[in-house]
Amino acid sequence: MHNPQHYMTGFGNEFATEAVAGSLPVGQNSPQRVAHGLYAEQLSGTAFTAPRGENRRSWLYRIRPAAVHGRFSLIEQSRLHNDFGGGPVPPDQMRWSPLPLPATPTDFVDGLYTMAGNGSPEAMTGVAVHLYAANASMHGRFFYNADGELLLVPQLGRLRVCTELGVLELEPQQVGVIPRGVRFRVELLDSAARGYVCENFGGLLRLPDLGPIGANGLANPRDFETPRAAFEQRDGAFELVAKFQGDLWRADIDHSPLDVVAWHGNYAPYRYDLRRFNTIGSISFDHPDPSIFTVLTSPSDTHGTANMDFAIFPPRWLVAQHTFRPPWFHRNVASEFMGLVHGVYDAKAEGFAPGGASLHNCMSGHGPDAATFDKASQADLTRPDVIAETMAFMFETRAVLRPTQQALSAAHRQADYQQCWSGLRAAFQHPPAKNTTSVLR
């Protein structure tokens, strides 16, 4: 693709970029004749009438319009879908070892594997959670998702995501967001790649409100990076793959759709380095709620309740006094899907490996394992706990995450996960009877 890789900084900004000078019209969006023989095309990510502060759209100036391709036909496959219904959902806590890497050549699209989800794209609420494992770049094919925006969380291997609006290079401990409808190709920069994907059907991801934290903190807007315009002009026999209403569809296309020479607007891919997250924590006592670790949030129609929150558990110092410092035992009205990008998660001493995943659905008890509890209960609190070399994350949703059948029956599901709490014994010592006010019998 033409143009060396550079980025523009800021979250949700109104950007303007061109790979060929003079391609952007001045003072209007759709001139009678666009410079250099390009076509003008608007890409809308929200309704035309959405409030200005929430309105997302970009104008693209491209070699051919997006409408130029063949007729779509259904791809028969069962790994990637929106089928979260039919059948009971067990309330068990669940954990999976890393998704095995493929033994045969597999690109990003073929390597997607649906784990769980809720809601639907037609209802414009909910999410789908996928894993990916690939060992080949996408050759001669391009992909777009009409169902939702994609939050990519690499765990193994670097990715070069070539999109209509420019190139995102991602490595583990960075995340990327591909807006709904944007066409792209994923190239592997290493021999294999694995990671996590949250497909957001609901309100577009945004930065959380900071409240009393103030004007700064958590993920700062200036650290988000959006690519500058880059394009390729290639003719040939290519394949365009679309995810639409939970199914994959393919169409022939005789040129690369990554042919946007210039664009302006605020609906575009972006990336963020999780190592730049400004972590907030207690410097007195107790462990604050994990909402303090929110990087991005998708709002719902209920004020104060997210459709989905993306939170991380990065390196940090724990200094709270008179306090059990690891994450506490918890039952949550929300549902939590966790993954581990790097290192060890401080609430699980064993069994939760990078590339692995866990699901704690609504009101399923969870928390530190027995080894972590015993260690933290006896820790010397005069010294800080330096949590280093780690990066865990969570997709938290207001609706139950319904695991797919392939996730429930997967060979890499850990059937003995509940045993991590089996060592938590009753240590209660009954005080003298005179100090007891009420006992159930």
Curated annotation (Swiss-Prot):
Coiled-coil region: none
One GO-annotated biological process of the protein: L-phenylalanine catabolic process
Sites where the protein binds Fe cation: 330, 336, 366
UniProt KW Transcription regulation keyword: no
Catalysis performed (reactions): homogentisate + O2 = 4-maleylacetoacetate + H(+)
CDD domains registered for this protein in UniProt: cupin_HGO_N
Matching Pfam families: HgmA_C, HgmA_N
Role: Involved in the catabolism of homogentisate (2,5-dihydroxyphenylacetate or 2,5-OH-PhAc), a central intermediate in the degradation of phenylalanine and tyrosine. Catalyzes the oxidative ring cleavage of the aromatic ring of homogentisate to yield maleylacetoacetate.
UniProt similarity note: Belongs to the homogentisate dioxygenase family.
Protein name: Homogentisate 1,2-dioxygenase
UniProt source species: Xanthomonas oryzae pv. oryzae (strain KACC10331 / KXO85)
Gene: hmgA
